[in-house]
Design a protein with these regions (language model features):
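Short C-terminal beta-strand
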Residues: 139-141
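Short, contiguous, helix-prone interaction/anchoring segments in small proteins
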Residues: 26, 32-35, 41, 47-49
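Conserved active-site tyrosine of GNAT-family acetyltransferases
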Residues: 33, 37-38, 108, 135
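Conserved Rossmann-like nucleotide-cofactor binding loop
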Residues: 103, 136
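Vicinal oxygen chelate
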Residues: 2-22, 44-96, 105-131, 143-150
Length: 150
C-alpha cells in the first residue's frame, strides 16, 4: 500500500478502505457506558462488549467510540496501564459541536445526561460540559452567529 485514502465518503467500522477514527474510553462498566451513549446521544451500538475485555463499539453521528475496561500491560502495549480518569483530572475530552445548544441541553438532560453547568457564553461560542459515569467530560458547544474558525 503506497497511500491511504483520506477523503472517503463512508466511515464504517471496520473500514473497507482508508481508515476510520474512533475515540477509546477506558470505563468501569462497558454495558453502562454503551447504554449512556446510546440513550443520551442516539448512538448505535455495533457491539455491546463485556467486562471480560471485549470492547463495545458505538457510532454517534459521524464518530465511533470504543469503550472497554482498563487493565495492565499487554504484549502489544508492554508499558501501558489503562484506567478510568480521576474525576477532576482530565487530560482529554470529547467535543460535540451542535447547531442548537439549548435544544440539545434540554433533550440530553431529559435523557439522563449529567451537565456540570447550564450552557455559558464564552468568546465566540456558547458551551457546557456533560460528565459521564466514569468521569469523562464531553464539551457541547455552539458557535455564536457570525463566528467562524480560522
Amino acid at each position: 500500500m503506497n497511500q491511504v485514502q483520506v477523503e472517503q465518503k463512508s466511515y464504517q467500522m471496520p473500514p473497507h478502505d482508508g481508515f476510520t477514527v474512533a475515540f477509546f474510553l477506558t470505563v468501569a462498566d462497558v454495558e453502562r457506558s454503551a447504554r449512556l451513549y446510546e440513550t443520551v446521544f442516539g448512538g448505535r451500538i455495533l457491539s455491546g462488549g463485556d467486562s471480560n475485555g471485549l470492547p463495545g463499539y458505538i457510532q454517534i453521528a459521524n464518530t465511533w467510540l470504543i469503550v472497554n475496561v482498563g487493565g495492565g500491560p499487554t504484549p502489544e502495549k508492554p508499558s501501558v496501564t489503562l484506567s478510568v480518569p480521576e474525576a477532576d483530572k482530565i487530560s482529554s475530552f470529547m467535543h460535540i459541536r451542535v447547531a442548537d445548544i439549548q435544544a440539545c441541553y434540554e433533550l440530553w438532560r431529559s435523557r439522563g445526561a449529567e451537565f456540570i453547568t447550564e450552557p455559558k457564553d464564552k468568546y465566540g461560542e456558547t458551551l457546557c460540559y456533560i460528565r459521564d459515569p466514569d468521569g469523562y467530560i464531553i464539551e457541547v458547544a455552539q458557535n455564536k452567529p457570525g463566528f467562524a474558525f480560522g
